[in-house]
Regions:
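Class I S-adenosyl-L-methionine
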Residues: 1-16, 29, 120, 124-127, 136-149, 157-256
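SAM-dependent nucleic-acid methyltransferase catalytic core
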Residues: 35-169, 194
Length: 256
């Protein structure tokens, strides 16, 4: 995430970053080790390639692994392999130009060839020698680093309650939130209550989460979400929460 990468690049703090989403991890590994090659591959792509690249990504064996046991065959494809650099370039292209953004989303109308060119140029100049990114689950990471300072950004807690404004999983896509819907929030709570080191935990603010982490410090930042900015439709869930989906409803939970 952006916070961890800034710690590493600006403060020169050694940061180990972990995520369960193998496609995101592949992107970061390539960006950290082969930024020039990643730039060269990404800069070959144009907005008119979006649908073709999306289909290639969907067929990627890493993507197909997401849909093992999925309830329909809508996303099923004959698996293909992609070179890690190509896969990273395709991921960057698809994610950054999509509405949301989200993985395997649809092309947003706000992007132009010039904006895409500017995005690619940032790849070329990226350097962050203090950051290492690996694929792992939160259970393994927390247990392997019992005394370290942790920053955690888990999927939103979705169980219905009077003050919970989140009602749909988003990771890696709202239509197949496989990493979101299966997340074990109680396991995370139990591990963090036993963690010896300090931590900062970012969550959606609701009574259940506040109860989970009673006794820790709470902070309530304010900002506006960019996801779906400009959307005017109001569904039943938004009506029930006051139709303020852009207003922040985050809580930072801190153990010092």
């Amino acid at each position: 995430g952006s916070l961890e990468s800034r710690w590493a690049s600006e403060k020169m703090v050694q940061v180990l970053g972990f995520d369960i989403f193998s496609i995101l991890v592949n992107f970061w590994r390539v960006l950290l080790t082969e930024p020039q090659k990643l730039y060269e591959e990404a800069s070959k792509l144009s907005l008119s390639d979006y649908d073709t690249i999306k289909e290639q990504l969907l067929s990627w064996n890493k993507s197909q692994a997401l849909f093992v046991g999925w309830h329909t065959n809508h996303y099923a494809r004959n698996p293909i392999e992609l070179d890690p650099i190509i896969g990273a370039a395709y991921y960057f292209f698809n994610h950054n130009l999509s509405y949301g953004p989200q993985y395997l989303g649809w092309l947003s109308s706000i992007y132009t060839p010039k904006k895409w060119e500017d995005m690619c140029y940032k790849l070329r100049n990226y350097r962050n020698p203090s950051l290492i990114v690996e694929e792992s689950s939160f259970e393994k990471v927390i247990e392997a680093h019992p005394n370290d300072v942790l920053y955690l950004d888990p999927p939103y807690f979705l169980e219905e309650s009077e003050d919970n404004k989140m009602f749909k999983g988003l990771y890696p896509n709202g239509n197949f939130a496989v990493h979101h819907n299966s997340f074990d929030h109680e396991k995370l709570r139990d591990l963090l209550h036993s963690h010896k080191g300090r931590f900062v935990l970012s969550y959606n603010d609701c009574e259940e989460i506040r109860n989970y982490y009673e006794g820790f410090e709470f902070y309530f930042p304010e900002w506006a979400y960019s996801y779906g900015q400009g959307e005017t439709r109001v569904g039943k869930n938004k009506q029930e929460i006051g139709n303020t989906p852009k207003a922040s409803h985050e809580i930072l939970i801190v153990k010092n």
